[in-house]
Amino acid sequence: MWREAMMELLDQLEAENPEDPALAPKDLSEWACIYIKYLQIMRKLETAYDQMVHPQKRQDMRKALEACIGRMLEIRHWMVKLNRGLDFINLDDILVDLKLGPEVLEVPVPKYFIEDRAKELDDRDKFLEALIEKYNVKGPAASPIIRIGAPLGEDEAILMIQKNERGRQARERARLAAITKRQRQIEDRRVRLGVTLSHEEAARKIQAAIRGFLWRRRIKKEADKELMFIGMKPKPRDPKRDPQMGEAKNLMRRKRVQLEHGREYDEAIVNLKGKVRELEGQDMRETIQDKVNAWFVEKRNPDTGEYPDFPDPDDGGSRAILNPPPPSLASLLEDAAGDGKGKGKDGKGDAKKDAKKDPKKDKKGGGDEPQAEEQKIGAVFIPAIEAAVQEFVAKWQDRDEADNFHQKYDAELVKDELRPIVFEEIRLQVDGEMRVLLQNLKDLVEAERAAKLGKKGKKKKGKKKEPFSRIKKELLKEAKTLAPGERVLVLGNSREPYLCAKKDEKDAAGDGKGKGKDGKGGGKPGTAGSKPGTADKKKKGGKKKSLCSDWSCGA
């Protein structure tokens, strides 16, 4: 029944929105046929939802049922508009054409409206009973009707009592007279017959009447058996085999199974949620952290090194980072306009001409009165119906349930439903951690900036130059890591740079002193070398001493 109703819902959507707009329903009779069809679908969905014991199917079925009810009310409201605002719509001719009875138009009230609120209604009744008992208030049916009027005088009261008493006595005399008349008639009939029955004769007459009744009943039973044997009369129903009684018992059993399966489903949600968090929570956390860290690096300012602000929780937090929204139409138009700026002047001129022509056309057409927009039926519940149909097709249409005879919950479907919930909870936790991390990074950047500004201020005040001995030690450490033939350009607080090379390689490097393969400087291409012309400069005070025994330095 559920499958049939969902297929009919899909057919209804296609009938309301056909590919050819000319075939769309327009007049009242067409919408009335669609309304009746929705009523039939709603009745099927309501029956299926009431009898279904699978907890997950009941959830999806209820979504489809509520969407169908909403769409039916939308069509009903639209039919009232087409009927010139009259709420009563005559659908007799349409029922005759469709060969349906008037009971089709009765809107059934879904049973879950009362069943889901049973506890609430019971609590309300108990509360009202407690209030009535507390304040000793009697119900309206038990309270006597008191008519307040002018008080009677003593004489009037006596006359009224006497009148009522005379009426009672007259009614009693009439009853006794009727009894006496009946007895007199019986005696007169006996006298006219002239025969007085004895006790034996009276007993024989009674026996004859009883025997006649018994034989007539026996013959009637035999006649009924004959008719049942030839198939002219149905057999009497056994109360134990009554189909209505069996249906009622089956309904009660299904309701009991519904409660049991629903209770098991609620318990499974709690247990499976913990398992999903335990098995897949760490992977979810790492995925979120990786994407947020990549966003930090991508959005960091390359010039200042500042990090962006983390989105507020009210704006969704990292949800926009994990699932960035698609570009809007305005941004696409801006990008297209930016690409069009590189075109020639002709393109600009044409655009200007078109821009000038459009306002003129608008001005010419401005004299016409705006046409009233055509009213359309509401379509609020159509997306809900489409989503319900798609969910049914994707989840239940081709699902093999041969192993689920008792129609209990499906653990895999429960996990699929719980993964987004667990992911959202972990995302909120990671957001809090990443906010703390981002604040620490910002504080670190601010500290580095403040340190740089402090060093610059000290240099401006005239800080003493570092001693040459410290530079010598650092140069020796760096020189040990160099490959043969590499050069080191000393930069820092020394007044002049020095080129260093090992003594045994000085002769090989001395032929092109200060020149590399390109002739621009010592060292391999891509390594640090001396500045052009630095080797030709003469130092004041003569040649410097070598830094060590194994290294020679020259300017």
UniProtKB/Swiss-Prot annotation:
All copies of domain IQ, residue ranges: 154-183, 199-226
InterPro entries from the UniProt entry: IQ_motif_EF-hand-BS, N-DRC_Component
Localization: Cytoplasm, Cytoskeleton, Flagellum axoneme
Region ranges (Disordered): 232-255, 299-377, 450-469, 501-555
Family, as annotated: Belongs to the AAA ATPase family. DRC11 subfamily.
Gene3D superfamilies associated with the record: 1.20.5.190
Entry GO terms, CC: axoneme; motile cilium
Name of the protein in question: Dynein regulatory complex protein 11
Coiled coil stretches, renumbered: none
Organism: Chlamydomonas reinhardtii (Chlamydomonas smithii)
Lineage: Eukaryota, Viridiplantae, Chlorophyta, core chlorophytes, Chlorophyceae
